[in-house]
Amino acid sequence: MKLSELKTGGMGTVTRVAGDARFVSRVTSIGITEGCPIEVVQNAKKRPILVFERDSLIAISRKDCDLIDVEERR
């Protein structure tokens, strides 16, 4: 499932970061890597998605979230 599909309060584990080398480098530099836990703090329509990962609160565009695959945790 894509990160953009997780609902507010949803938690998951990153399974893949797709995209070109520049995007992958940018995302990994802020700590989003395969295997890291991630929580969606806010997922409002047509707005960037606010996520919490590794003690940081990060806003990510919907377009970028579509390139990040996660496995939902319950």
Spell out what each predicted region is:
Residues 1, 20, 42-47:
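Short, charged beta-turn/beta-strand-edge "cap" motif at the junction between a beta-strand
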Residues 3, 27-31:
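Short, surface-exposed secondary-structure edge patches
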Residues 5-18:
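Short, basic/aromatic beta-hairpin or loop at an interaction surface
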Residues 9-12, 43-74:
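C-terminal structural segments of small proteins and small subunits
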Residues 22-26, 36:
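Short alpha-helix capping/helix-loop boundary micro-motifs
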Residues 34-40:
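Conserved beta-strand/loop element in small beta-rich adapter and peptidoglycan-binding domains
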